[in-house]
Amino acid sequence: LVDALQLPGAIDGELLIRRDGLVQSFNVLQQRLNRKTVTPKLLTEFPAHLRAYDLLADGDEDLRGLPFSARRERLEAFVARLNSPRVDLSPMVGFAAWDDLVAARKDPATAGAGADAAAVEGVMLKRRASAYLPGRPTGPWWKWKRDPFIIDAVLMYAQRGHGKRSSYYSDYTFGVWTRGEAGDELVPVGKAYFGFTDEELLQIDRFVRRNTTKRF
């Protein structure tokens, strides 16, 4: 991926694993992250990919003050100059009415996501006239996530978080019961480390400390 990014500039994008033309899950990406040694096999099995969302700089030119519509045009030209299969553009979602956008969010496959629909988290709304602002600006931008799937699961593991959450058990692994050859068994199905308030975090942290049965 580094070899593909040889033009001077600054891209706002997302690091992905794209295998056989399909964007893989975040769990697959985690198998490439934080590796001290990256073997040729790992590079082949987990090829890094960049999906470009915005362009902050083109060469020495700072584009952050330009409206999004102008930055998008520059981004499209920038990615075209890169001319690499390792970098692509986040598709624009056209809509004439709010109901069209609701439908696109609900079914990304019909709104340009194609085979990557299962990996889409939602839609990002940006005012066409908005400048590029640091942090998480409210008003000109809005990240509208897809509705989550809900299941009843068992909290299997809890890990301490990072930064201000380093003193709390804030990273959780959940599992569900399944019938195996040896009888019922718990199988991990996913992880979660956000989606709860600070008050709920304290409640879960206390529960974990009081009910831990094993440590790893």
Residue ranges and their predicted role:
Residues L1-S170, G175-F216:
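Catalytic cores of nucleic-acid ligases and guanylyltransferases
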